[in-house]
Each structure stands twice: as C-alpha cells, then as structure tokens.
Amino acid sequence: MRDAYLMMVLMDALKEIFDLKEILKSPIRNKKVILFVSLVFILSLVLLYILVVNIKYFSYLGDIIFQNFQKHVENLKITLNEDNLHIILAIWKNNLTVCILNYILGIFSLFVIAVNSYILSYVLYKFGAESFIYLVLPHGIIEIPALILSASGGVLFNMGLVNFLINIKFGTKREVLYYIKESLKLLILSIILFIVAGIVEGTITFKIAKIMFS
C-alpha cells in the first residue's frame, strides 16, 4: 500500500512539473527568489562595469576572463563559415551545460551569475555600446532571463535540500516536495528559453556578426 501511495504521489508530482500552465505560473509564485537573483545580476553588472572602467586591475582581470571565454568558444569549433544548424547545436550544448550546472550549484550559482555579469560589463567596456547591442542583445534578452531562472531554480532546490537535511522550521515533507517541484519547473522553463536563445544566436546574431566582420 505504501509503495502504491508513493508511486501515486510521484506520478502526480511529475504530471504537475511537466504541466505547461504550471511551468509558466512558476515564476510568479517564486518571484521573490527570481527578483533576488535578478538583483544580484544587475548590481554585479553595474558595479563591475564601474570597476572595469575606473580600475586597471579589474580591466586586466577582465582580459583574462574574456580570453578564457574566447578559448571556450573556440573549443565549440564555430566559424563564420559554419552552417546555422551546426552553430545552433553547438550553442545548445553549451547553454544547456550552463543551465544544468547553474541548477546543481544551487546558491553557488550566484557566482556564475557574477562571472557572466563580469563578461558582459567587460564586453560593453571593451567593444562599445554599438557592438554590445548588435552582438549580445538579440539573444541576450532571452538568454539572460534563462540564466536567472536556472539559478533561481538552483536556489529553490537548495532550500528544499536544507529543509530535508536539517529539518529546519517548516521543513515538512510537503514543503520539501514543493521546493523541488518549483525548482524543476523553473529549470524546464530556463531550458526552453535557452533553446530559443540558441536559435536566435545561431541565426540572427550570427548573421549580424558575419556582416560586421566580413
């Protein structure tokens, strides 16, 4: 009887997690966590841009981080002569890796958020607003929310684990299950957005890059 009950609970949970309406409502229910992660991203972006512009050390550190980022992009083996499908698949692989890593890291995904803010602030400083608008914004307006959602999902998952392991106040099984379900809904939504962002980056942004660098 207990096994049958657990199976029924699991099936109900899976049905809820993959319900599109529930997935779309999840950001509203978890807006406080999402706003917190968004605030970390925005403040990091603004603060790091100010530091990069005004302090040479941060500009130098930005050089190192950006060079490592470029090496990572080169490892994807994307060139201006590649077909769109190859580019999109390579971007998807990279984006989904970041998405899952963000989720697994939980609260430590805020460090990933800060590093991405550093890269964006450095690109804006190094290449100017025009290049930033043309080469980052087309896919960035989708990719950045996806990054924030995956990090928010990771934070929620951590909250569920803390409740489970330490059994702090309100640490009931129902509370733990709620956190895990909500975190997975945000993860699924972030994956969807990362897929869309990859298509935009592999088509629109890529075409803009070809025009600018040809």
Swiss-Prot record:
Disulfide cysteine pairs (residue numbers): none
Its membrane topology: Multi-pass membrane protein
Bilayer-spanning residue ranges: 33-53, 104-124, 132-152, 153-173, 186-206
Keyword Cell membrane: yes
Keywords, comma-separated and alphabetical: Cell membrane, Membrane, Transmembrane, Transmembrane helix
GO cellular component: plasma membrane
Intracellular or extracellular location(s): Cell membrane
UniProt main location, coarse: membrane
Pfam families: SpoIIM
PANTHER family per record: SLR1478 PROTEIN
Protein name: Uncharacterized protein MJ0706
